[in-house]
Amino acid sequence: MNAYYEQDADLKYLQGKNIAVLGFGSQGHAHALNLKESGLNVCVGLRPDSSSCEKARENGLEVNTIADAVAWADIVMVLLPDQYQKSIYESEIKPNLKEGNTLAFAHGFNIHYNQIVPPGTVNVIMIAPKSPGHLVRRTYTQGNGVPCLIAVHQDYTGEARQQALAWAKGLGGTKAGVIETTFKNETETDLFGEQAVLCGGSAELIKAGFETLVEAGYPEELAYFECMHELKLIVDLYYEGGLSRMNYSVSDTAEYGGMTRGPRVITSDVKAEMKKILEEVQDGRFAKEFIDECNAGYPNMKKLRESNADHPIEKVGAKLRDMMSWLLKK
């Protein structure tokens, strides 16, 4: 995959245009502020009763309702939660889109699964920073940026790709590198990674390890330290230099034990189940399940949240984290 940098992008494709950023959460505040400080004309679209209205104004941004922001804008970036985008699109975005506008997203879920079907007379693009919003913002203020993905779903004006690259440049992304992909590939890999590894697989691995030690008679505190707390040390090594950096940094005992026992935990059966999870993402079964869950008021999700909150690892973890002065208390 090719990477694009500063010389490959030109802010002229956004200059002189009205840009609306819908939402002012983690990504929304970073996009709006970075683009504004890149010299672009930005407003934020929010519900009138949103607690973020005051925050956005305190940061020197103009705030409008979502409908008014879209009506004013040439380019609209939708940075709202996936489950709310369809209804807001139908009621406030779609009626105010104009021919030649650009509709932008930071995640492809609603476009890829046809929850949102824009008219053929607009550009549809994606700019997805591969970092949380606070890091997008911080690196920009330091004169750097984070890697970004871009994609073009629909190019009505002939400038969709240039606009996506320009947006990434306005975020600071072209200083790190920008990779072009598709809505399909971004959506499916993102969902799979969340479910099988990052949020689902890792959480279940942690709980299973904790339970194994506790059921064998070891103190919960030791089980927490070994299966939850110390995971950050290992993940940071992965993050900084991959698997080889981790293996180089740990003891020979840990390296040998990990290489010989790890495959007994993540077996061919586990990988087969991962493939099934990927198939559910690819064929839309997961998307339908999630949308149905949202429409029903999250009955299953509420039960799962309660179950996780009641797990013993959460109780002992809260107690041990109170001993850690370096952690921010919330």
Swiss-Prot record:
GO biological process, one term: L-valine biosynthetic process
Essential cofactor(s): Mg(2+)
Cofactor annotation remark: Binds 2 magnesium ions per subunit.
Catalytic activity: (2R)-2,3-dihydroxy-3-methylbutanoate + NADP(+) = (2S)-2-acetolactate + NADPH + H(+); (2R,3R)-2,3-dihydroxy-3-methylpentanoate + NADP(+) = (S)-2-ethyl-2-hydroxy-3-oxobutanoate + NADPH + H(+)
UniProt GO molecular function: ketol-acid reductoisomerase activity; magnesium ion binding; NADP binding
Binding site for NADP(+): F24, G25, S26, Q27, R47, S50, S52, D82, Q83, Y84, Q85, G133
Major enzyme class: oxidoreductase
Record-annotated active site: H107
Span of domain KARI N-terminal Rossmann: 1-181
KARI C-terminal knotted domain residues: 182-327
Keywords, sorted A to Z: Amino-acid biosynthesis, Branched-chain amino acid biosynthesis, Magnesium, Metal-binding, NADP, Oxidoreductase
Binding site for substrate: S251
PROSITE patterns reported in the protein's UniProt record: KARI_C (PS51851), KARI_N (PS51850)
Cysteine pairs bridged by disulfides in the record: none
KW Transit peptide (keyword) present: no
Binding locations of Mg(2+) 2: D190, E226, E230
Cellular compartments per GO CC: cytosol
Entry annotated with the keyword DNA-binding: no
Record-listed Mg(2+) 1 binding positions: D190, E194
Organism domain of life: Bacteria
Pathway listed: Amino-acid biosynthesis; L-isoleucine biosynthesis; L-isoleucine from 2-oxobutanoate: step 2/4; Amino-acid biosynthesis; L-valine biosynthesis; L-valine from pyruvate: step 2/4
EC number per UniProt: 1.1.1.86
HAMAP family with a match to the protein in the record: IlvC
Role of this protein: Involved in the biosynthesis of branched-chain amino acids (BCAA). Catalyzes an alkyl-migration followed by a ketol-acid reduction of (S)-2-acetolactate (S2AL) to yield (R)-2,3-dihydroxy-isovalerate. In the isomerase reaction, S2AL is rearranged via a Mg-dependent methyl migration to produce 3-hydroxy-3-methyl-2-ketobutyrate (HMKB). In the reductase reaction, this 2-ketoacid undergoes a metal-dependent reduction by NADPH to yield (R)-2,3-dihydroxy-isovalerate.
Similarity field: Belongs to the ketol-acid reductoisomerase family.
Protein name (Swiss-Prot/TrEMBL): Ketol-acid reductoisomerase (NADP(+))
Taxonomic source organism: Chlorobium phaeobacteroides (strain BS1)
Gene encoding the protein: ilvC
